UniProtKB/Swiss-Prot annotation:
The reaction(s) this protein catalyses: 2 L-glutamate + NADP(+) = L-glutamine + 2-oxoglutarate + NADPH + H(+)
Chain spans, region Disordered: 890-913
Binding residues for [3Fe-4S] cluster: C1113, C1119, C1124
Name the record gives this protein: Glutamate synthase [NADPH] large chain
Basic and acidic residues biased stretches: 900-913
Induction line: The gltAB operon is positively regulated by GltC and negatively regulated by TnrA under nitrogen-limited conditions.
Needed co-factor(s): [3Fe-4S] cluster; FAD; FMN
Length: 1520
């Protein structure tokens, strides 16, 4: 049995889609003292992180756990009596996993011995590692490797440790390469003279039980680096357990494909003094089949072996953000700039700890997206981990408590016996070479001269526009809004046009590629509010020598954006510099596209051989005979070709393109390798619009605004995948193809997913030539086509919702006419191939049933849901109509992310129920309170939305009416954007935590997780099932939206058919399908659609666009403008009067769908719905599919693949609620108090494994007493210790939680009226404002209550706070981000980017240096004031007095003692719009209006200034 049992690709499953996350930890003695206790404590730490790891279908088989320690020299001398070991550090130990086959093992050992001797080293002997197979899980046992250790003696010529380590590395790399050639499985967990790794497919508590070595008292080390893994799959893979050879990694490398490609390109240019002739023996440097963590480890190890210090290597691979950081020293800035000219960052959420055995370091990614806390003790120990409380320590012995900050490093030097600070280590490394001098002297400046610009005068402009697919819609609905609005324009209602491969029309190649996005396993990042971590810097020219620092390396051109104006482009192509020659290649073809590509390759290679370093690919010389090669194909093909030839780093690829005009085009070109792009035809189009008077702006301003908008759009596209820098995005191929053949992908887009195959090179050529021919033949038409991508037009692109389908559906449901409904479904199903499901036909040979034998419509309809559409996006009338209808049917409506009015939780007098059965929890957490959560049958975590995955929801300010703001806890008239990520979900184990939180908040509700279809969503779904979700929703890219960038609507995500089938198949392969209910949504329109979804694996079904159409929507696609003419998607009281919908219409629609489903079931012979699920054997490709000129090339077999196993939900998840502290301890002690309202006061010990303390108790209060809760301080809970994550989440009024000690992330998440007090433990006597006492993302989405924190907090404190009043003694970066209410008093330092996106509430920050504080703030939305209002001063003083009373804060006490002076040191931070609204409201109230009327008048005044809204004594009624 082999130790690696990752299944081969089958159906839609691909092994390369696997992701992982984890908990990491380090326990070390700073002076290097080696003890067995360190090993024991490391193992204990591992067990305390068990909840951050994962288990699959076999609960006794972990996803992987292990530890990395120093070589235990005394232990090996005791155990290896028959091996003559040289002195310490003069021998290396290899930890090797072999197959259990003895003959295979002996063959491998023989080869390893030969390689050791060949390299001049000494084979000292082998040892079989004793293991206890009976102590591990069944699945782990079946795949358990045979573990052996090889001992290698150093030759006398290797004088130092690094030379010996390098030789061991060369031996291992050769052995690995030989193994690949021979097709033999073995794996070196480690091979070093300094460190050794013990790991496996184990749970944390199994590690020392399995490896008895670890129990021996002689097994000593000065440190233990530990890791507990959570994989998205359940397949046994021993080698993917951590630690790796140099590092443990918690996070994900989002740019991996690009990092691999660029390393591959560079390694053929490497020359190394350290390796000499051994360099070729170690290639390839990266094992591309490994996990992202192991590939990062490969890169880290190589640079260390090549002579870089570990800390230097970490700074190169994971640089802190420097381009926007004005606080950074010029030396450090120069270091980062120099290295950025040589290589791109390895970007993504990352906490790594690394070691070479002498130094141990840790570094956090630039965004601070992983937790990393540490204690330093008075007796010289450091405890570093993802969580505090993992090792017990006397508080009197703790010297200080801290956290690793974004981009910062912690370094422990065991030989020097001290911690080296981030500032010291980076300054030391940054000043080793004169980087600043080199940059000043060698960087090549390009200064565009406006006078020298080649003026673009195209006599054939219209022809060119037509040839490149320009339409009137492109210009009027995209190019002009881009510069007027300064961003990618918004659209709404989603995409209902066909995929490019299904379209009857010739399509741009760009349209076959879909942008990838982050969900669950890594977060999207916030490119708008957290812009300081992004960079658009671009380097041109040949790359320098990465291994040898030199001034020559920076002889390159630095650009601040990859979008080139004509002036910049002209300056580049005419530059005179010996190292920067340019050459233009015409990328055109006449008949043979393949020939055209080969000619381009030949010309490029020749140019590079002649010293050219700037290659310009131009289509400008197109004519009637010569067609442009699609620029995306030209760029990617050349990029891949040059990588294969080892030439890519010698040249930059610059594109002069007539086709590139949208954000998606630029993103795709950069993503596939373009260094810079000049969109000459877009500029010429602007010039035409200006010259002809249709655009009132100067040409220079238009070009500037366009370049800025496109650049920001590209950053937003990158950020959806969690990538911060254009440099990392370039060549990273963060796309998937839909409808491109495997041959084209392998040759020209290698590494890109294309799950269904598709069109070949000939068809790509035909599409380009068809457009080209039409452009040159179309002499009689002097105008562009109108265009119909976003809006239906007669004769244009097909749209599923068109006048015929809309009208027929509405009348059928209004009249309750099933025959008319059948006319609608005939039109929807049969007119065109609009969706992938239209490519299938049913097996006509099935034995039919009588209709009455089939499950009833009343039963089937209970599987139906309406989609997540928020109150705010929809009118009150539309939102409630959906809820009433679905509750009548026994189905479910979904609140969406805008909260819900509590009045709806009580049934109406007529028996109707307006309560949404599904309550959504999205990243904005609007209205998410304990009372909201307990009033649900299902709680849905929205990880992504089909129309805009990787982005937050948007509600424009003109739709945030007072009643909407009230439900959302925000400011009327101020636009709301949800953060792109859930700030408590940066990885799979974070999602598991939120699922656990919500299950605690409502034990009776199912927990649902909404994902968007993409390649790899199946593996993510498996991880979500392991994270104990009850329902998984796979949403299609074509889902509706109230407001989304057009780029996202068209170009992100996949059809649900692909994602659903992949999720179903992957869950079955993992043995997890029976644990979850699978649901799908995204333009489900008919009963046939439901049947197709069921056959592909769905059990439940969401409808959103169709029900809105039923209620009256006419697809005006103006939802975001608040101008909906039928009262569906507006808050405007006058327009809402036009609402004609009725819950009965929705009831009719749903029953019609169910009835049509029954007809199909009868025809196919299925008696019950469950029988039909996953039965893809009744489908085959339709005749229509076989006849279509493009769709006929698709391979649909992967969609229909059926693995063996259970196809439906069978067994509920085990949420382990019965093991929670609330159930075992708290609730029994306070149950009587909850029931009687009497006071209760209890004391409880707590540790980091006790998560979500207080939440279940709070939910019981909310169920009984509603939003009012209990009187203040009714239930007092006194905790002592280190609390686990989500301490006090969602606790309502009446509960007070005291914590003596410290806490992990998410304290007070969703606080709903309760009170939280955290103070330092008895005995810990360090200054509170110098010590970190709670973790990241505290009080996220909190709605009311109060809190007092006697110490510092981590990153993103009070994100989306909408009502809590809190005092804290210092916070990290991004504090008060997206805050909409409440007040935050900070008695200490704040981190960078304070108050970004803050639209409500007030912060009061104590500072000695106001200027320095202001430099840390995001100034976009806020004002600074001093504290002058006496009432306000008294409020702050009262908060400090309570803080002192609750926490004994010395800091607060000192401030109160000197209050007259102290108050002058506070800076008040208030959002501009919030202040304006408050002032307007007071003004209206002074004029005699009631509170309600004043708020409405203020809203009108601030959002609709043209209307006369002055209060003139006349009172207006407010419609609610």
């Amino acid at each position: 049995m082999t130790y690696n049992q990752m299944p081969k690709a089958q159906g839609l499953y691909r092994p390369e889609f696997e992701h992982d996350a984890c908990g990491i930890g380090l326990y070390a003695h700073l002076k290097g003292k080696q003890t067995h206790d360190i090993v024991k404590q490391g193992l204990k730490m591992l067990c305390q992180l068990d909840h951050r790891g994962g288990q699959g279908s076999d609960p006794d088989t972990g996803d992987g756990a292990g530890l990395l320690v120093q070589i235990p020299d005394a232990f090996f001398r005791k155990e290896c009596k028959n091996i003559n070991l040289p002195e310490k550090e003069r021998y290396g130990v290899g930890m090797v996993f072999f197959s259990q086959k003895e003959d295979e093992r002996k063959k491998i050992e023989k080869q390893i011995n030969a390689l050791i001797e060949q390299e001049g080293q000494v084979v000292l002997g082998w040892r079989t590692v004793p293991v206890n197979v009976g102590k591990i899980g069944t699945v782990a046992q079946k795949s358990c490797p045979f573990v052996r250790q090889v001992f290698i003696g150093a030759s006398s010529d290797l004088k130092d440790n690094l030379s010996f380590e390098r030789k061991l590395y060369v031996i291992r790399k050769q052995a690995e390469n030989w193994g690949v050639t021979e097709g033999l499985d073995f794996y070196f967990a480690s091979l070093s003279s300094q460190t050794i790794v013990y790991k496996g497919l184990l749970t944390p508590e199994q590690v020392d039980a399995f490896y008895s070595d670890l129990q021996d008292e002689a097994f000593v080390s000065a440190f233990a680096l530990v890791h507990s893994r959570f994989s998205t799959n359940t397949f046994p893979t021993w080698e993917r357990a951590h630690p790796n050879r140099y590092l443990v990694h918690n996070g994900e490398i989002n740019t991996l494909r690009g990092n691999i490609n660029w390393m591959r390109a560079r390694e053929q240019q490497f020359v190394s003094e350290s390796f000499g002739e051994d360099l070729n023996k170690i290639l390839p440097i990266l094992n591309a089949d490994g996990s992202d963590s192991s590939i990062l480890d490969n890169a880290f190890e190589f640079f260390v072996m090549a002579g870089r210090k570990p800390a230097h290597t970490a700074m190169m691979l994971i640089p802190e953000p420097w381009t926007e950081n004005t606080h950074m020293s010029k030396e450090k800035r120069a270091f980062y700039e120099y290295h950025s000219s040589l290589m791109e960052p390895w970007d993504g959420p990352t906490a790594i700890s690394f070691t070479d055995g002498k130094q141990i370091g840790a570094i956090l990614d630039r965004n601070g997206l992983r937790p990393a806390r540490y204690y330093v003790t008075k007796d010289d120990y450091i405890i570093f981990s993802s969580e505090v409380g993992v090792i017990e320590v006397e508080q009197e012995n703790v010297l200080y408590k801290n956290r690793l900050e974004p981009g910062k490093m912690l370094l422990i030097d065991l030989e020097e016996g001290r911690i080296i600070s981030d500032e010291e280590v980076k300054t030391q490394i940054a000043t080793e070479y004169p980087y600043q001098k080199w940059l000043e002297e060698e960087l090549v400046q390009v200064n565009p001269d406006p006078e020298s610009r080649e003026e673009e005068q195209f006599s054939d402009l219209l022809t060119r526009q037509k040839a490149f697919g320009y339409t009137y819609e492109d210009i009027q609905k995209y190019l002009i809004p881009v510069i007027k609005e300064g961003k990618d324009p918004l659209g709404s209602m989603g995409n209902d046009a066909p995929l490019a491969v299904l379209s009857d029309r010739a399509q741009s190649l760009f349209n076959y590629f879909k942008q990838l996005f982050a969900q669950v396993t890594n977060p999207p990042i916030d490119a708008i509010r957290e812009q300081l971590v992004t960079s658009t810097m671009t380097w041109l020219g040949a790359e320098g020598d990465l291994l040898h620092p030199s001034e020559r390396n920076v002889r390159r051109i630095k650009l601040y954006t990859p979008v080139l104006s004509n002036e910049q482009f002209y300056a580049l192509k005419t530059i005179v510099h010996p190292d920067l020659k340019s050459q233009k290649i015409d990328v055109l073809f006449s008949e043979d596209l393949e020939r055209g590509l080969k000619d381009m390759f030949t010309q490029a290679e020749k140019a590079i051989s002649q010293g050219v370093s700037l290659l310009i690919l131009s289509d400008k010389k197109m004519n009637e005979r010569l067609t442009p090669i699609p620029p995306l194909l030209a760029v990617s093909a050349l990029h891949q070709h040059l990588i294969r030839k080892g030439l890519r780093t010698k040249v930059s690829i610059i594109v002069e393109s007539g086709e590139a005009r949208e954000v998606h085009h630029f993103a795709a070109l950069i993503g596939y390798g373009a260094d810079a792009i000049n969109p000459y035809l877009a500029y010429a189009t602007y010039k035409q619009e200006i010259d002809e008077g249709r655009l009132d702006i100067s040409y220079e301003e238009a070009v500037s605004k366009y370049g800025k908008s496109i650049t920001e759009g590209v950053v937003k596209v990158m950020s959806k995948m969690g990538i911060s820098t254009v440099q990392s995005y370039r060549g990273a191929q963060i796309f998937e193809a839909v409808g491109i053949s495997r041959d084209v992908i392998d040759r020209y887009f290698s590494g890109t997913a294309s799950q269904l195959g598709g069109i070949d090179l000939q068809t790509i050529a035909e599409e380009a030539q068809r457009r080209h021919r039409e452009a040159y033949q179309d002499d009689y038409s002097k105008t562009l086509e109108p265009g119909s991508d976003f809006q239906w037009r007669n004769g244009g692109e097909h749209h599923a919702f068109n006048p015929k389908t809309i009208h027929t559906l509405q009348w059928a449901c209004r009249r309750n006419d099933y025959n008319l409904f059948k006319q609608y479904t005939k039109a929807a199903d049969e007119e065109r191939i609009g969706f992938l499901r239209n490519l299938f036909a049913f097996d006509g040979n099935r034995k039919p049933l009588k209709l009455e034998e089939v499950e009833s419509a009343e039963s089937i309809v209970k599987r139906f849901k309406t989609g997540a559409m928020s109150f705010g996006s929809l009118s009150k009338e539309a939102h409630e109509a959906l809820a009433i209808a679905m509750n009548r049917l026994g189905g479910k409506s979904n609140s969406g992310e805008g909260g819900e009015d509590p009045k709806r939780f009580v049934p109406d007098e007529n028996g109707d129920d307006r309560r949404s059965a599904i309550k959504q929890i999205a990243s904005g957490r609007f209205g998410v309170k304990s009372h909201y959560l307990v009033n649900a049958d299902e709680l849905q975590i929205k990880m992504a939305q089909g129309a805009k995955p990787g982005e937050g929801g948007q509600l424009p300010g003109n739709k945030v009416y007072p009643w909407v703001a009230d439900v959302r806890g925000s400011t009327p008239g101020v636009g709301l954007i949800s953060p792109p990520p859930h700030h408590d979900i940066y990885s799979i184990e974070d999602l598991a935590q939120l699922i656990h939180d919500l299950k605690n908040a409502n034990r009776d509700a199912r927990i649902s997780v909404k994902l968007v279809s993409k390649a790899g969503v199946g593996t993510i779904a498996a991880g979500v099932a392991k994270a104990t979700a009850d329902v998984i929703v796979i949403s299609g890219y074509d889902g509706g939206t109230g407001a989304s960038p057009k780029t996202s609507i068209k170009h992100t995500g996949l059809p649900w058919e692909l994602g659903l089938a992949e999720a179903h198949q992957t869950l079955m392969l993992n043995g997890l399908r029976d644990r979850v209910v699978l649901e799908t949504d995204g333009k489900l329109m008919t009963g046939r659609d439901v049947v197709m979804a069921a056959l592909l694996g769905a059990e439940e079904f969401g409808f959103a666009t169709a029900p809105l159409v039923v209620l009256g929507c006419v697809m005006m696609r103006a939802c975001h403008l608040d101008t909906c003419p039928v009262g569906v998607a507006t808050q405007n009281p006058e327009l809402r009067k036009k609402f004609m919908g009725d819950p009965d219409h929705i009831v009719n629609y749903m029953l019609f769908i169910a009835e049509e489903v029954r007809e199909y079931m009868a025809a196919l012979g299925f008696k019950t719905f469950d029988e039909m699920i996953g039965r893809t054997d009744v489908l085959h490709a339709s005749e229509r599919a076989k006849e279509h000129w493009k769709a006929s090339q698709l391979d649909l077999s992967t969609l229909l693949y059926q693995p063996e196993g259970v196809r439906t939900f069978q067994s509920p998840q085990n949420h382990k609620i019965d093991q929670s502290l609330d159930i075992t301890t708290i609730l029994p002690a306070v149950q009587e108090a909850i029931e009687s309202g009497k006071e209760a006061d209890i004391s409880i010990e707590i540790n980091n494994t006790n998560r979500v303390a207080g939440t279940i108790t709070g939910s019981e209060i909310s169920k009984r007493y509603g939003e009012e809760g209990l009187p203040e301080d009714t239930i007092k809970l006194h905790f002592t210790g280190s609390a686990g994550q989500s301490f006090g989440a969602f606790v309502p009024k009446g509960m007070t939680l005291y914590l003596d000690g410290d806490s992990n992330d998410y304290v007070g998440k969703g606080l709903s009226g309760g009170k939280i007090i955290v103070k330092s433990s008895e005995g810990f006597n360090s200054a509170s404002d110098d010590n970190v006492i709670i973790g990241n993302v505290a009080f996220y989405g909190a709605t009311s209550g109060e809190a007092y924190i006697n110490g510092r907090a981590g990153e993103r404190f009070a994100v989306r706070n909408s009502g809590v009043n809190v005092v804290v003694e210092g916070i990290g970066d991004h504090g008060c981000e997206y805050m909409t209410g409440g007040s935050v008093v900070v008695l200490g330092d704040v981190g960078k980017n304070f108050a970004a996106g803050m639209s409500g509430g007030i912060a009061y920050v104590l500072t000695e240096d106001v200027k320095a504080f202001k430099r840390k703030c995001n100034l976009e939305m806020i004002l600074f004031e001093s504290l002058e209002d006496e009432k306000e001063i008294q409020q702050i003083k009262a908060m400090l007095e309570r803080h002192t009373a609750y926490t004994n804060s010395q800091k607060a006490e000192d401030l109160l003692d000197q209050w007259e002076d102290s108050v002058k040191k506070f800076v008040k931070v208030i959002p501009k719009n919030y202040k304006q609204m408050l002032a307007s409201i007071e003004e209206q109230k002074a004029a005699g209006l009631s509170d309600e009327e004043a708020i409405m008048f203020a809203f009108e005044a601030n959002t609709k200034p043209k209307q006369n809204t002055a209060a003139s004594g006349q009172k207006q009624a407010v419609v609610q």
